[in-house]
């Protein structure tokens, strides 16, 4: 089979050490990946015009009630997001023209709307990281904000690489010494965490933000 870059800049097997083994440290990985990537601009496929019965591909529709949660709490997400490729592009353009120059500083403050908020759109395929990459690289000269933002794309690439090479990390620690870390199994504590009721303000704010908007600020995710 063949790999096609549908979700990343570089496929995981394209970026390796000289001996063919995967990188486990971010900095050398991204230095190699950033220099390796060459953008391939999508081309129109004239053969698609011959597909007269393309509508038949979608005759077996999936009913929304079969895939959506039983609780309708997600309805409020409509206040915060407008899912579409067009709106993802507008969000990116707004970020690049108005926010990215200060991204290096403002991204560290969860109370400030200083990030791109593009992660839901990237995750659902409404915008591709290659487009984000191109738009960022069109800005001359590059300021610290652009560099920091592109670096975050690098972390996403690195995560995809690690998961492909080490799928066991989805259910365990990549570094086995962390397996000895004490784990408290307490349903009451777990529910308090999910509801944003732990008593730790920064944790609770993040969980409530997630429940309200379906999104959590990057810095809070790290907490």
Where are these regions (language model features)?
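Trp/Phe/Arg-rich N-terminal binding region typifying the photolyase-homology
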Residues: 1-46, 145, 208
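Short loop/turn and capping residues at structural boundaries
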Residues: 4-7, 132, 164, 221
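Conserved aromatic-histidine-acidic binding/catalytic patches
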Residues: 10, 14, 21, 80, ...
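Short clusters of hydrophobic/aromatic residues that line enzyme substrate/ligand-binding pockets
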Residues: 15-16, 26, 103, 183, ...
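Generic recognition of short, well-ordered alpha-helical interface segments
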Residues: 21-24, 87, 131, 201
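Glycine/tryptophan-enriched, flexible segments
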Residues: 28-177
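C-terminal substrate/ligand-recognition segments
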Residues: 160, 165, 189-223
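Alpha-helical cores of eukaryotic small-GTPase signaling modules
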Residues: 170-198
């Amino acid at each position: 089979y063949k790999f096609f870059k549908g979700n990343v800049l570089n496929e995981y097997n394209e970026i390796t050490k000289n001996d063919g083994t995967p990188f486990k440290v971010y900095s050398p990985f991204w230095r190699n990946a950033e220099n390796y990537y060459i953008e391939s601009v999508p081309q129109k496929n004239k053969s698609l015009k011959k597909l007269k019965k393309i509508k038949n591909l979608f005759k077996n529709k999936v009913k929304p009630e079969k895939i959506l949660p039983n609780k309708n709490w997600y309805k409020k997400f409509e206040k915060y997001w407008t899912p579409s490729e067009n709106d993802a592009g507008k969000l990116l353009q707004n970020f690049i023209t108005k926010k990215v120059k200060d991204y290096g500083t403002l991204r560290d403050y969860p109370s400030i709307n200083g990030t791109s908020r593009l992660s839901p759109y990237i995750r659902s395929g409404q915008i591709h990281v290659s487009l984000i990459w191109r738009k960022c690289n069109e800005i001359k000269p590059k300021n610290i904000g652009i560099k920091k933002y592109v670096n975050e794309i690098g972390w996403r690439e690195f995560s995809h690489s690690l998961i492909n090479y080490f799928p066991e990390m989805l259910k365990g620690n990549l570094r086995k010494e962390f397996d000895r870390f004490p784990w408290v199994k307490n349903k009451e504590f777990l529910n308090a965490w999910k509801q944003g009721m732990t008593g730790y303000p920064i944790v609770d704010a993040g969980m409530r933000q997630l429940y309200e908007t379906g999104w959590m600020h990057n810095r809070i995710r790290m907490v």
